[in-house]
């Protein structure tokens, strides 16, 4: 399954000429993460980092939406409030989002949503290797020049599949679902030579 996902995602990620890719992004930040079930339902802070592309950012037939894909690392966790122990999981994170944008002067606001897939890179116990979910996100970009930009994003990861299963005293399995709230900052570099009209709306 992972090979199928990578075969679809990687050509999309790197084939920027055909998809009119515009901005290469590098980001990192913190992740407020918790499980949906006791005893690991107390939030704790971990970290995340990713490499991404924004593409279809500017076309002749539209100037209000674009696509964004990322591949990176995310640490999911949850804390036992009584014992202080944590349930930690390391994942390779992939997502592709459909985003709408509004630009004014040298700022751009965006909001988007799309599917995400996490692959457990260090497996133990009865954990699931693949976690499917959705990722809504909002962001703000500030353009330092025609090529360089800084941006800040807030994203929420909602898992549709469990990340861990544990045997209970009655021999039944409890499945844990993870929730993550990500706060990231990053830098973007425009790779296309064609000038992008970031300030299209400022002249309206």
Locations of the language-model features?
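Bacterial Sec-dependent N-terminal signal peptides
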Residues: 1-27, 187, 191
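Outer-envelope beta-barrel architecture signal
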Residues: 20-24, 61-67, 105-111, 146-150, ...
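Glycine- and aromatic-enriched membrane insertion/assembly motifs of diderm outer-membrane
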Residues: 23-34, 39-96
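Residues on the lipid-exposed face of transmembrane beta-strands in outer-membrane beta-barrel proteins
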Residues: 30-32, 49-57, 73, 94-102, ...
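Outer-membrane beta-barrel translocator domains and adjoining extracellular loop/strand segments
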Residues: 36-42, 79-85, 122-128, 163-170
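Internal catalytic-core helix/loop-beta-alpha segment
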Residues: 110-125
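Outer-membrane beta-barrel "beta-signal"
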Residues: 177-204
């Amino acid at each position: 399954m992972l090979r199928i996902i990578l075969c679809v995602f990687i050509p999309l990620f790197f084939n920027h000429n055909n998809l009119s890719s515009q901005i290469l992004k590098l980001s990192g930040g913190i992740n407020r993460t918790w499980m949906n079930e006791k005893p690991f339902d107390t939030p704790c802070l971990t970290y995340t980092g990713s490499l991404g592309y924004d593409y279809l950012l500017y076309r002749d037939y539209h100037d209000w939406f674009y696509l964004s894909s990322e591949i990176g690392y995310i640490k999911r966790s949850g804390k036992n409030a009584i014992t202080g122990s944590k349930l930690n999981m390391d994942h390779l994170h992939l997502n592709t989002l459909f985003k709408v944008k509004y630009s004014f002067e040298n700022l751009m606001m965006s909001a988007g949503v799309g599917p995400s897939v996490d692959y457990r890179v260090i497996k133990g116990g009865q954990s699931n290797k693949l976690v499917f979910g959705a990722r809504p996100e909002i962001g703000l970009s500030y353009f330092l020049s025609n090529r360089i930009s800084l941006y800040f994003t807030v994203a929420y990861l909602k898992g549709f599949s469990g990340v861990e299963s544990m045997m209970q005293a009655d021999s039944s399995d409890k499945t844990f679902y993870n929730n993550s709230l990500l706060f990231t900052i990053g830098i973007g570099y425009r790779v296309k030579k064609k000038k992008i009209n970031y300030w299209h709306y400022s002249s309206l």
